[in-house]
């Protein structure tokens, strides 16, 4: 099928595009810069120039495609402290894409995050695909997409863990944590660091997007999760080894100062299961886990 992909030259997109092409699909990738356009063309995709603010352009591209994968997000706004603006832009873009697909039965695969499960108040057990919150940042877009199943769209949402890792990752949370460790001289965790974060390799996540596009039933929540939950102190220890800095506990009161915009997230306990997704899509993670990938060294050679 012909697939329109936003964020096609980004971290996840740079794995999703080859995954789609290798499976025999045609890809039209959204590019907002000359560099992004060149990268997409080199990968074998058709290029459509534009950005998330061009809502009419998004509608036109979605209408012309057989399916849509929405990966783009204004991460720069989030890093600059304008998270609400990034959330609003994502919801507007999602609604624009959806408006072109209603009543067609075409697939729309969009993106959310497992950290948003904290809005559902889940504690003491791994979050599952059946769990959801009534509202909140990114949750509103997620619930909107699930609701499209009743409006003639084969919609699904992929929840990514807070760390999606590989050599394709140049700006994700792993890089941020490494940068903080080097800047402060300490690889930190909050309190006793027993809270858990899930993770997935980029190439494994890309397969979830492709399989979701091809086969997920309308209204599916999918978990692209390989490591169900790694103690944050273990993540900090791996970063400490790679960066050559000591590992230390940071008090909850000092977390915002030490971890900057990540201060509100690093102490969250977010174990997440992908059992339902694996059975539904026939997907099995096949690439290295987070600690192995950090110990490989490429993050520290490039950071």
What are these model-derived regions, one by one?
Residues 3-23:
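N-terminal Rossmann NAD(P)H-binding glycine-rich loop of SDR-like oxidoreductase domains
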Residues 26, 81, 88-135:
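Conserved Rossmann-fold NAD(P)-dependent oxidoreductase catalytic core, especially the SDR/UDP-sugar
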Residues 29-92:
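NAD(P)H-binding glycine-rich loop region in Rossmannoid oxidoreductase-like domains
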Residues 143-167:
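Conserved beta-loop-beta element that borders a ligand/cofactor-binding pocket
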Residues 169-176, 189-213, 220:
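Substrate-positioning beta->alpha
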Residues 187, 208-262, 302-303:
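Mid/C-terminal beta-alpha module of Rossmann-like enzyme folds, strongest
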Residues 202, 256-284, 300:
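Conserved C-terminal active-site "lid" loop/helix of NAD(P)H-dependent oxidoreductases
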Residues 288-303:
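Amphipathic terminal alpha-helices
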